[in-house]
Each structure stands twice: as structure tokens, then as C-alpha cells.
Amino acid sequence: MAKEKFDRSKTHANIGTIGHVDHGKTTLTAAIATVLSKKLGGEARSYDQIDNAPEEKERGITINTSHIEYETEKRHYAHVDCPGHADYVKNMITGAAQMDGGILVVSAADGPMPQTREHILLSRNVGVPALVVFLNKVDMVDDEELLELVEMEVRDLLSEYDFPGDDVPVIAGSALKALEGVEEYEDKIMELMDAVDEYIPTPERDSDKPFMMPVEDVFSITGRGTVATGRVERGQVKVGEEVEIIGLTEEPSKTTVTGVEMFRKLLDYAEAGDNIGALLRGVSREDVQRGQVLAKPGSITPHTKFKAEVYVLSKEEGGRHTPFFTNYRPQFYFRTTDVTGVVNLPEGTEMVMPGDNIEMNVELISPIAIEDGTRFSIREGGRTVGSGVVSVIEK
């Protein structure tokens, strides 16, 4: 039987449940899918189906993640849920599951716990744009004042990490009771999803963002000029438009795209996802190299110093067997190339062990086109030993 057609008329967003262990993330995920399927049609998912998350490999890192899909009246969602805390850390840093927004689950019976804090910090550092809060297990709390106290604590915690704590929607309910079909709690799930629909911004499509293409290879074609090839990461470029060549040199240089070719056919323009060759006017083969990017002028700039949130692979994942210290000098692999950089650990951190995650300062020996949210791998001799995302650009 043919699968039903994917409905493109609804906007699509990627979200995930985050929060402390045993506060009810997976139960809530099951409750959302179940209640929405009951009210609006679609596939219900049981707790067990979600909890037995398959192992995935992303950049050589083993991550257990469950992906489910569901729809509200307004949107189509892909929802990611992870069984273990380490899986969240890896997922968010590698971008294995890009999140346009998150549902922070906090048990009303326990209040915010250490991983609640850590997941909020991670969300901020990896650039999750918005969070909505679900206060779970309210059926276990008799005291109305206690609920208000927990809500205040969560709001303060969000504000501490630069989320708008006063404005974030907080919905109180019970995922378990909703799964059991208790109507007042099913209504709370619908209320939560209304908040997610309204409060989590519609993600900007890659094709609407400013043009950027990482350069993978460079050819010179006799009589025509220099061609840079690569996959357009975002935006679009039209023949005749000006672009900048950015990275690995002190200053970006400007050129004009005089031709766009894909599968040996000439195009008027290329957009996100296309593998193309871009013919560049007045550029010699020496002026452009792998590791640079072509980009809309002024949209991205080259930098050497930044803060990053990093996950260090464990020995079992093929990572290092020993810790590293400040002044560690590995290669940082951005898009298509390795650049050596020097690591500076935060004050009070003596060393970083395999399997840890850490916020560190990095200084590259050559400038690379980066911005907040740019992802990279850390490598030693071609072997991946870490994965990271730029959280703050410093220079």
C-alpha cells in the first residue's frame, strides 16, 4: 500500500523534549502523539515504542534517539526524544536532531534539578530559539502554592540563561494521566501544543537564508575561468550576482558568479541543497581553495576566536584514551577543511576527560567563516575526537 502523501501545506518544525531524568520526557512524548491522534487523527505511539530508541551514528558518535512525527491543526512536527542524559548532550551538540524549539519537562513534585539546568544551558549554547515549559506530575502535588513556587523557580532559571523567563508559556499537567485518557489532562496536552504552535517561531527555510556554499574543489577551465564546486548550504545565488570568498585569508575577496552548472547543465540560479559548480569572474585558481565559502557579501565574516560547546568522544566511541588540558592543539574541521586551533579551558577546569562535555575557548591559526551555531568536529590525525558548536564569537 502506498504511504500517504506528505502534506506540504503545513509548516514543518523540529522540536524535542528536554529536562531531568525521570521527570517524564518520554511519557510526555507518547502523550502528545496519543492525544493528537485521538483528537485530530494520525498515529498514536506507546511509551515502549519511544523508549526503545535505536542507536544512531552521527559524526562517529553513538546516540540513542527516538524520532516521531505528529500534526497539530497548524503544523507538522518532527519530535526527538532521548533516553539518556548523555544522548541529549551529544544530540544537541552534534546537531543530529536540529531543534527549532524545545519542550522543557519539569516534575512539579521535584522542581528543577541539575539536568534541568544543564539542558537549558545547552539549549542556549547550541542556539535553540525558544522553549515552552510543561510542569508534569501535577496530579502528585496537592499544594497549589508549591506549584506556583516550582513555576517561579523554572522561570528564574530560564532568565538566568537568557531565555525570556517571564514570557515563556508554562503549562501544568500530567503526561501519565493524559496517556490513560483522563480528559482534563488530555486538554492540558492540547493546551501545551497550542502554546508550542504559537510560541515556537516558524523556522526560516534554508532557501530563504543568505547564500552560502562551502568550497569543496576548485578547477580552472581554459578559456572560461575558475570554477568552485560544492553543495549550496543555504540561500540561493543567481548568475550575475556578486559573492564574497571568505576564510583562510586575512580579508574576504569579492567576485561575480558568471555561471552556475549542475549535472553539466547550465542554470540561471542555484538554491540550498544543489551540488553545483560556480564560475567565478576574474579569479585565478590560487585565489580560491577548499575550506573557504562563497557567500552573499556581508552575510558571514571570518573569525579566529570563539567560545564553543563541545562533546569529547569517549574511548569506546573511538575518541581519545587520555584527558587533554589547556593549550591542547588539535584540528578543527569546519565544513570541508581542518584548521589547527588552540584550546583554552574555562577557569577551574583542570582537564577534560573523554566522554565529557565542556564550554571552551578556541583560537584558530587561520580565519574561517563562522557564526553562532556553526558546527565543527575536533580531529587528531584525521580521527574525530570531539564535536562542537560555536556559542559566542569573540574575534
From Swiss-Prot:
Mg(2+) binds at residue 26. Gene3D superfamilies: P-loop containing nucleotide triphosphate hydrolases, Translation factors. SUPFAM superfamilies: EF-Tu/eEF-1alpha/eIF2-gamma C-terminal domain, P-loop containing nucleoside triphosphate hydrolases, Translation proteins. It is found in: Cytoplasm. Residues 10-204 form the tr-type G domain. Keywords: Cytoplasm, Elongation factor, GTP-binding, Hydrolase, Magnesium, Metal-binding, Nucleotide-binding, Protein biosynthesis. Residues 136-139 are annotated as: G4. Residues 174-176 are annotated as: G5. Belongs to the TRAFAC class translation factor GTPase superfamily. Classic translation factor GTPase family. EF-Tu/EF-1A subfamily. GTP hydrolase that promotes the GTP-dependent binding of aminoacyl-tRNA to the A-site of ribosomes during protein biosynthesis. Monomer. This is Elongation factor Tu.
